[in-house]
Amino acid sequence: MPSKRTSLLIIFLTIFINMVGFGVVIPVLPFYAERFGASTWEIGWLFGIFSLVQFFASPILGQVSDRFGRRPVLLLSTLGTAAGFIIMGIGQTLTMLFVGRIIDGLSGGSIGTAQAYVADITAPEERSRAMGLIGAAFGLGFIFGPAIGGWTAAQFGYSAPMYVAGGLALINSVLIFCILPESHPKEKRQLSKKSEPLFPGLFKHVEVKPYVTVVATYFSMIAGFSIMTGVFALFVFHRYQFNAESTGYLFAMIGLIGTIIQGGMIGRLVKKYGESRLATIGALFLMLSLFWMPLTAGVAAMVLACCGIAIGNSLLSPTLTGIASRSADAEWQGRALGLMQSMGSLARWIGPVLAGWLLAYDLDKGIAAYARTPFYTAAGFLLLTFILCLRLPARLVKKPEPLA
C-alpha cells in the first residue's frame, strides 16, 4: 500500500494530466469553432455546455464515490474525458464539437472526487495545504496545457490539440488503474449507503452557515472568472493581435504563478493569516485585476493584469475548498465537495454564455470597446465574492476526523 505522500503525489499527477488536457483547448477552442461558422454566442455556449452538463453530473458522481469508492469514479471520468476530446478531434461540424463537450462534461466529476480523495487521507488542519497541492497541479496544467495547445494548433492545425488532450486522458486512466489505491474504506462506504439522500441529508452532516457561505462565494468567484476565460482569447486577438499560440503562453504564465503560490506558499500563508483572510485578499486581487484588464493600453499592462488574476485565484480557490472540506463530516466529504464543484460547474456555464452575449453587445460598439462589458461584469461578480468572503468564519469549531 503506497504511503500518504505517495498517494498525494499520484493524485497530483492525475490532476496535472487532467488539467493539461483541459488547458490544451482553452486558447484554441474559439478559433476552432469559428472554422465551423460559430458566432460569439455559440462559442460561449461551447464553453458553457461542458459545465452545464457537469453541474448535474458532479453531485451524482460525488455520491457514487462515497458509496463505491473514489478510484472507480476517477477511472471512468478520465475515460469519458478521453472519448469526448477524441470526438472533438475527428468531428468536422459544430454539432460534433458540442457532442464531444457534452460527453466530457458528463465525465467531469474527477476534480471533486480527487478533492474528496485528498480529504480522505489528510487531517483537517492539513486540508488547505493539501488542496494547495491540487491547486499547484492546476497551475502546472495551465503552464503546459495552453502552451502545448497553442503550439500544436500553430504547427498541425486546430484539431491536433484535441487528440493531444484525448491521449493524455488515456494516459491518466492507465495511471489510475495501475497505481492509485482506494482511499475510501469499505466500512465508510457502508455508512454512506445507510445515510440520507443528498438533500436534505447533506445539511445534517455539514456546518450549514459556513458551508452555504463558502459555496455561494465559490459560485460567484467561478462565474466571474469564467466570464474572463470565455472572452480572453478573442479579447487579446482583437486588442493586441495575439493568436492561439501567444494566448497559450499567456495562460502558461498564469499557471506558473499559480503553481508557485499554491504549491510552495499557501500552507505557510494559511498558518500565518488564516483561510478566510487569504480568501478575502484573493477576491480583492481578482476584482481589481478584472476591472483593470479592458483599460490596459499596452501588452505590459495587460500582462500585469493577468498576474493579478493569477495571484487572486491562487489565494482564493484552495482556501475556499479547505473551508468547505472541514465543514463536512468525513463520510460526506465526496458529496459536500461534489455539490460545491457542481455549483462551480453551474457558474462555468453561466459565465461563458453571458460572456458571449456581452461580447456581441460590445462588438456592436466597435473594437475600441471590445470586451469592456464582459470584464466589468466579471469584476462585479468578484465584488460580490469579496463581500461574501468577509462573512466567512475565521475558524470552524467542528473538525471532522479524517478517514485515513
Residue ranges and their predicted role:
Residues 173-179, 376-404:
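Multi-pass alpha-helical transporter architecture, strongest
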Residues 154-167, 357-380:
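A membrane-interface helix-boundary motif in multi-pass transporters
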Residues 276-320:
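C-terminal transmembrane helical hairpin of 12-TM major facilitator-type secondary transporters
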Residues 55-94:
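Conserved MFS/SLC helix-loop-helix module at the cytosolic interface between two early adjacent transmembrane helices
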Residues 100-139:
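Cytoplasmic helix-loop-helix junction between adjacent transmembrane helices
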Residues 27-41, 230-246:
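Short amphipathic helix-loop junctions that connect adjacent transmembrane helices
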Residues 1-5, 181-216, 404:
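Juxtamembrane intracellular "pre-TM" segments in multi-pass secondary transporters
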Residues 58-69, 261-274, 359:
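Helix-to-loop junctions at the C-terminal end of transmembrane segments
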